[in-house]
Amino acid sequence: TEDAPLPDSIFTCPRRSAAAIDSPLEEVRMTGDFGNVSEFMGRHLPFLLAAADKYIKPAIRYQGCAYDSGVDFLLPNRYFTLWSTSDSRIRSTLETFASAGEQLENLAISEEDLRGYILSAYAQALPPSGMLNGRMRFLRRRLFGISTDHINKMIMDIRNSSLKDQRTAAKLIHKIL
């Protein structure tokens, strides 16, 4: 009711959590919250996608039993998600997710590969635009206290990604997970 405010504690989530439900979908997710890791920048996002392409998907989908897997990020909420679907090997999937940062450090990534991951990061970071979409997005961000400046800095920094950033990205992703 309006007279009994909800305690803030119901809105907090544990740092690490996982849930497994016996269903046909069997979706597994691990979320990395980079909101409190100031060193994590837009230039590190393409390396998340490289880890998904060169480590997570081969380990979970092709060698495991999952239907699909990947990595998504949501800049306004400052987190990324490693996910798999129709995955019955929950324990090994979570172990694979947890080691993504360590594995990324030694992945072979060419300049050409990195350019593709940079484009993919832009595609995921830039929401649809239009006359109403932009205004509604601004209002939602303002309402929820989301910094448009921070999001724009992350997006602008994607293009600064270089192979020199791979080791730092790996260490930060490992720290976040």
Annotate the PLM regions.
Residues T1, E26-L48, D53-L163, L177:
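M16 family metallopeptidases and their MPP-like homologs
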Residues T1-E26:
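An aromatic/glycine/proline-enriched structural segment found at the starts
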